[in-house]
Amino acid sequence: MEQEIKPKRPFCASCSKPMKLCICSRFKSHHHSINNSIAVTILQHSQEKNHPLNSTRIAALGLKNLQVFAVSDIHFDARFEIQLNKRSREEISDAHLERIQKNGESFDLDEEECVISATMTKFGPTFTDISHLQCNQCHFKNPNFDEVLGSRVGQDAVSNGFVVKKLQREGEELSEHEEFEISVPPGSALLYPTKKAVAVGVRVEGFGFEVKNLIVLDGTWKKAKRVHQPKAGCLSTIESIVLALKVFGEDGDGLDDLLEVFKSMIGDQVRCKDEKFRNMKSSNTNP
């Protein structure tokens, strides 16, 4: 006896929701996304994309100046290459750090690519190539991220922007493959709760620079721990983005519209769960 194959549910190509739960028409200005002056870069866990309450889909439909990059777990190891922008290299040169020892030989910084390379495993990061940090201001052994960020090279990279590339390896015998390459512009700030974080909404002046780009980690807090060192929070991705953009002076009315869409999406999920529960209860009571 052949088993009947149920047809798959149709999904919306824009919001990735089932057609009967499509949210595209719920935006008050669904023909015109908000032209946010502060860019938003979302690093989304690969398993988060199809989650029913994934709110990045709302940000993608409602904000023009936005990029989303998929980030996966590290099962074996991954190598991160950080390429400094030209301005960073010039500032290091101006600080008389042109000649740095590399494998016992001198080289001119302007003639070399200024790259910081780190390998990340399940057990944490290891800097495998920090030759550009071996200068009179960077005397440390086996540096951690805080030490690298505190160095002149690290500070210049944060101030002037950089490009980071992730090369993933799934096993010892397998070759690397590029997962992403992201350009982090000057004025970028990570929207994430840490002990050293500046509280959003307290005072904009506390950042010490003009914020032009927000970097947001999208995933459950358990998944996000693998990307950073978090402290649990309670806001969704879209709620966090809206709050931050409002603090920096973006259009409040348009941003509130995004929150209304999110609330309606939560309502859909609650109704679907209730309906599923009722159907299960009904099937169990019927003879």
Question: Can you say where each PLM-predicted feature lies in the sequence?
Answer:
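Flanking scaffold residues of small Cys/His-coordinated metal-binding clusters
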Residues: P7, K17
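Short cysteine-rich clusters marking metal-coordination/redox-active sites
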Residues: C12-C15
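Cys/His-rich microdomains that often coordinate metals
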Residues: M19-C22
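Histidine-anchored nucleotide/phosphate-binding helix
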Residues: S25, L53-G62
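Short cysteine/histidine-rich metal-coordination sites, predominantly Zn2+-binding motifs
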Residues: R26-I38
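Cofactor-binding loop segments of dinucleotide-utilizing enzymes, especially the Rossmann-like FAD-
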Residues: H45
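S-adenosyl-L-methionine/SAH cofactor-binding core of RNA-modifying enzymes
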Residues: K64-R226
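C-terminal folded domains that constitute the principal catalytic or ligand-binding module
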Residues: F207, K212-L214, G219-P287
